[in-house]
């Protein structure tokens, strides 16, 4: 599933892929034939709300069995979700869609976007060579947001700076480096 998620994440950078991935229905160029995404069509037919699934591709292999790679929209943020080894059983049909929706609902109920650093926050300072002053503050250029558990502890967030010394003259808004943000050791 991880490999499929990485492939989907990469493919979503291609506009043509997104156009096909997001479409629910296709019509042939001569207008004679139509295709629908059966996995979504059958779920909607059985009154399953699939609105959080913005795009998807289903498949089957003997190894992974029924799979669904999808793009979920949860509170206006997009997540790639891949489920595999899904099996229909008595009372549990549309397994790949239901598994995907269960994961999406879990994310919606337990995670949210947190603004962890506001724009123009002083984060550090760097040395300046040949300047009238020997250091300058490093300020964030924009708000920094992250998807975190609803009950996260701010002390679990750590920052790792990759800063470089600057040489005068220093221009306003000159980039001084980068910063990695970690939540409980996960970047």
Labelled PLM ranges:
Residues 2-187:
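Domain-terminus/edge residues, biased toward the C-terminal soluble/receptor-binding domains
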